[in-house]
A protein has these predicted regions:
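Bacterial Sec-dependent N-terminal signal peptides
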Residues: 1-21
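Extracytoplasmic/secreted cell-surface and envelope-processing proteins
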Residues: 36, 92-95, 119-122, 178-181, ...
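Structured beta-strand-rich core segments of catalytic domains in phosphoester-bond hydrolases
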Residues: 88-174
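Extracytoplasmic, non-cytosolic globular domains
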Residues: 112, 155, 159-250
Length: 334
C-alpha cells in the first residue's frame, strides 16, 4: 500500500512540475553590445581598442556585468522567462551575457541569426530551457530595396512550453528615425509590412496561434506603422480575432516611455500579444495590466542629464552604464 501511495505521489508531483503557472516576457535594447574584436563584415571599428571609443576588455566586461544586473531583476525582481534583445553584434556576446554569474543559474539558451544590418547589429532571443523548447526559427529581412539600405532581420521563434502549448515569439528592431521620423517613416512601414506578412503566414496554418511580438520599433503605439499598417488594437476588450493587442498603449498615453529624447519620453520598446492570449483564460494568457517599464534610480543618470537612462557612452565619454533604453516586460499566467 505504501508503494502505491509513493507512486501516485510521484506522478502528481511530476505533473505539477509540468504546469506553467506564470511566466514573464521582456524586451531590452542592449545598446551596442559589441565584443572588442574587429569584424571585417560589419562597421564596428569604434568598438575596438584602437577605435574612437577605446573599447577594451575592461569596458566589455563591465558592460556584460551591468546588463546582467538589470536582467537578473528585470521582471518583478527576477530574471525573465523569455527575453528579446537587440543591438547585439553576434551570438558570442549573448553567450558571454548569459554566462555571467548572476544569470548562469537561470539556465538560459539563445536563438540568434546574423543579419545584414549596416551597423552590424542583430536581434536575439533568450529563454529558460527548463520552460521552453525551440522547434524552429526563421529570419525575415524587411524590403528596403528602394533605398538600398539594409536593416535588422525580424526573428520568428516557435516552440513549446512545458505544458505542451505552442508559442510564437517575433523579435523586432525596426529602422531608426535617423534623418527625422517623417523622412524615415517608409522604412518602418516596410518593417511593419514584413511583420504583418509573418503574422498572416502563421495564422494561415495555425488559426488559433498564440503570438507575442516584441521589439524596439522606433515608432510609438499611435504611429502609422503600428496603428494602421499592423492594425494593432489599444483596446483589450475590443481586440478582434487575428489582431494584436498592444500592452503599452496606455503607458504611452500617460506620457511615459522607454527612451528619453530631448526631455520627452518615447514609448519605442513594446510588447504585443495576439487576441488568442486575451480570450483563452483556461490556458496560457496575458495577465491584465501587467505591462511595465523597468526603471530604477541606479539605472538613470544624475547631474546635467538627470533622469535619462544611464548608457555606456555619452558621445565618446565612457559612463559605465547600462543602455540608452529602459527594458519592458509583461506577464503571462495559466
Amino acid at each position: 500500500m505504501k508503494w502505491y501511495f509513493i507512486l501516485i505521489l510521484t506522478i502528481v508531483l511530476s505533473c505539477n512540475e509540468k504546469e506553467l503557472k506564470t511566466a514573464s516576457v521582456a524586451f531590452y535594447n542592449l545598446e551596442n553590445l559589441f565584443d572588442t574584436e574587429p569584424d571585417s563584415s560589419s562597421i564596428n571599428e569604434p568598438f575596438t581598442p584602437e577605435g574612437e571609443k577605446k573599447w577594451d576588455q575592461v569596458g566589455y566586461t563591465n558592460k556584460l556585468k551591468n546588463l546582467a544586473k538589470v536582467i537578473g531583476e528585470l521582471a518583478n525582481g527576477g530574471a525573465p522567462t523569455f527575453l528579446g534583445v537587440c543591438e547585439v553584434e553576434n551570438k558570442k556576446v549573448l553567450e558571454d551575457l548569459i554566462a555571467q554569474p548572476s544569470l548562469k543559474k537561470e539556465n538560459y539558451a539563445i536563438v540568434h541569426i546574423d543579419s545584414p544590418d549596416e551597423r552590424g547589429i542583430d536581434v536575439g532571443f533568450i529563454y529558460k530551457k527548463s520552460i521552453f523548447t525551440v522547434e524552429h526559427f526563421t529570419a525575415h529581412q524587411p524590403d528596403l530595396s528602394y533605398s538600398k539600405d539594409l536593416t535588422r532581420d525580424i526573428l520568428h521563434v516557435q516552440g513549446k512550453v512545458i505544458n505542451g502549448e505552442t508559442l510564437h515569439f517575433i523579435i523586432n528592431h525596426w529602422p531608426s528615425r535617423g534623418g527625422g521620423s517623417e523622412a524615415s517613416e517608409s522604412k518602418r512601414i516596410a518593417a511593419a509590412t514584413t511583420l504583418n506578412n509573418i503574422k498572416v503566414s502563421i495564422l494561415k496554418t495555425e488559426p488559433n496561434a498564440k503570438i507575442i511580438v516584441m521589439g524596439d520599433f522606433n515608432d510609438e503605439p499611435s504611429d502609422k506603422s503600428i496603428a494602421e499598417v499592423l492594425d494593432v488594437s489599444c483596446n483589450q476588450s475590443n481586440t478582434a480575432k487575428g489582431q494584436f493587442f498592444n500592452a503599452f498603449c496606455d503607458i504611452e498615453k500617460a506620457g511615459k516611455g522607454s527612451y528619453l529624447y530631448r526631455d520627452s519620453w518615447d514609448m519605442l520598446d513594446q510588447i504585443m500579444v495576439s487576441s488568442t492570449l486575451l480570450s483563452d483564460t483556461n490556458a496560457i494568457h496575458f495577465k491584465n495590466n501587467s505591462a511595465t517599464i523597468k526603471s530604477e534610480t541606479w539605472m538613470l543618470q544624475t547631474g546635467k542629464y538627470e533622469g535619462y537612462p544611464l548608457r555606456t557612452y555619452g558621445g565618446n565619454t565612457y559612463l559605465n552604464g547600462y543602455s540608452d533604453h529602459l527594458p519592458v516586460f509583461i506577464l503571462l499566467q495559466n
